[in-house]
């Protein structure tokens, strides 16, 4: 099941007044998968050897720790190659914090315990539990440091671009393989393909990447008071 499908399954349950608890794990996994897709690229830097790879990795980590904003376009296709969903959005990153915006969703994590999103379409404000397990998966620094969790192989190197395949060493991952393409000399990727266990493929193209040194942790705090007309759904 693709990221967008999981989100919309949860939204449909809310809209139809169904019990949303069974859908919670799907949505949480989807959000973590999306952040992983956006950030997995720098892990491929260790497919190279020597001080150059170390320097690039440290530069990528510092870039995210200091603040960065990424614009992306994504498309999800099924096993038959049919497009299920396409969208554009923005993700802002500052150390452990992120703010992800796409379609009618505004998803926030403050790096500590506040994990929430606002659904503009249904006018819902949803709160999740930012426990240690979720923090570990969503923390960009920890993700950048987890290169040993993937088996990496170089697929191609041409026209100033390197393409790598990353497969998880641990079983049970929602993604069977990442295919990551990035320009030489750049820490963050330009294209990421995530192939799910079910065979769905989500292709993310990074259309813009800029430093965002003025980001503050307060920018990632989302409260119900910002949406006075919204229904608050507390799943903590």
What are these regions (language model features)?
Residues 72-74, 99-103, 163-171, 191-195:
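Short beta-strand segments that buttress and anchor functional surface loops
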Residues 129-160:
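Flexible, surface-exposed loop/linker segments and immediately adjacent secondary-structure boundaries
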Residues 85-137, 197, 202:
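An acidic-aromatic
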Residues 2, 24-43:
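Gram-negative bacterial Sec-dependent N-terminal signal peptides
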Residues 93-94, 108-110, 178-191:
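A short, surface-exposed beta-strand/turn
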Residues 1-24:
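N-terminal secretory signal peptides that target proteins for export/translocation
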Residues 49-50, 158, 169-176, 184-236:
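Non-transmembrane domains of secretory- and envelope-associated proteins
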Residues 36-38, 42-83, 94-97, 225-236:
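N-terminal leader/targeting segments and the immediate start of mature chains
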